[in-house]
Amino acid sequence: MSLDIQCEQLSDARWTELLPLIQQYEVVRLDDCGLTEVRCKDISSAVQANPALTELSLRTNELGDGGVGLVLQGLQNPTCKIQKLSLQNCGLTEAGCGILPGMLRSLSTLRELHLNDNPMGDAGLKLLCEGLQDPQCRLEKLQLEYCNLTATSCEPLASVLRVKADFKELVLSNNDLHEPGVRILCQGLKDSACQLESLKLENCGITAANCKDLCDVVASKASLQELDLSSNKLGNAGIAALCPGLLLPSCKLRTLWLWECDITAEGCKDLCRVLRAKQSLKELSLASNELKDEGARLLCESLLEPGCQLESLWIKTCSLTAASCPYFCSVLTKSRSLLELQMSSNPLGDEGVQELCKALSQPDTVLRELWLGDCDVTNSGCSSLANVLLANRSLRELDLSNNCMGGPGVLQLLESLKQPSCTLQQLVLYDIYWTNEVEEQLRALEEERPSLRIIS
């Protein structure tokens, strides 16, 4: 049983009503409920009295160091079996981290801890790592995004990785680790028997100089399945240094996120070698890189190779034009693996979308999700899209948000959505404007077809 309350300011009467439930439910989530330290004594008593509790989430509440301390005291009892604890954005600072080592030692059942958006800093992280290294601590997943960490924190973290073979997920995104810190972290990973599965280092000040270190990590960690290096200035040189590790048989990576990494078509050449060779790679994001049409051509050639089994490709905001769409048409008609294509925020226009629609109208296409938001599609382009909705049997989600169409274009889509042969399940139309009459028709259709969601 779960108690899941979000974005509700809890009155005294409502709080009195909830306290007995907090003492009973296995999962308790009270996110963004306006809780402060004042309520934490009650929470502490309630969780202490609840031996069934396996998950507690108090994210986005101003608990402060005192409030967090009270909650953790309540969890430290012999009957507590909690497995997942989220204290994201709760105002935990260095001053409140002194309780963490004892908490981690006593909660041997705890497997997942979220401390994102707490300004604990390097000193707080050091205290946390003292607890993580204790033999009684069995934590497997740790999230520390936006925690004011620097390179100083990387040595304690590396020490944890060296001794914790069961550690599976580490999120350090949006911390100023920079080149020295990432090098220390990578060395710790290479030296350890840690079976890490997911490493997220978005916006950590990584440069091309770190990519040889990261190459060694992906080469040595067969357990690693997800790597996020988004919003780091890797450049083409960094991608060239990373890819040899990705090509090795020991690398089993499934998901690679490279948003906004200063990659151009030149960098695509190295990535294309990986796509052709690695059947394990299923998700690739290259959003917000200046790939342009030449980069799209190179990617599509690789997607057609038998060795490529990619299922999801994100190329949002990559300066693609209608000239790139014939390349994707070949992929859409021939690929048996690509299920999701995110092309939003590229000026494809009606010409490009009409080209894509020719391919999507062919029998036996397998694409399930297509994102074309902010692609300069007008009412004219909706005619081709409406035909796709009738002809295509695989497409389940279509995003057309923030395009130049209006009521007439939406009505064309609506006519296709009414037909029994249309199998679409979700249509997203944010920031598109139509009359009240069109709105009434859309909502009436949703009532007639409960399996269809129209989000606007």
From Swiss-Prot:
Molecular function GO labels: ribonuclease inhibitor activity
Record bears the keyword Cytoplasm: yes
N-acetylmethionine found at: 1
Positions of post-translational Phosphoserine modification: 86
Subcellular location: Cytoplasm; Nucleus
Keywords per UniProt: Acetylation, Cytoplasm, Leucine-rich repeat, Nucleus, Phosphoprotein, Repeat
Recorded domain comment: The LRR domain forms a horseshoe-shaped structure that interacts tightly with target RNases via a large protein interaction surface on its interior side.
Subunit structure: Forms high-affinity heterodimers with RNASE1, ANG and RNASE2.
Function: Ribonuclease inhibitor which inhibits RNASE1, RNASE2 and angiogenin (ANG). May play a role in redox homeostasis. Required to inhibit the cytotoxic tRNA ribonuclease activity of ANG in the cytoplasm in absence of stress. Relocates to the nucleus in response to stress, relieving inhibition of ANG in the cytoplasm, and inhibiting the angiogenic activity of ANG in the nucleus.
Official protein name in the record: Ribonuclease inhibitor
Annotated source species: Mus musculus (Mouse)
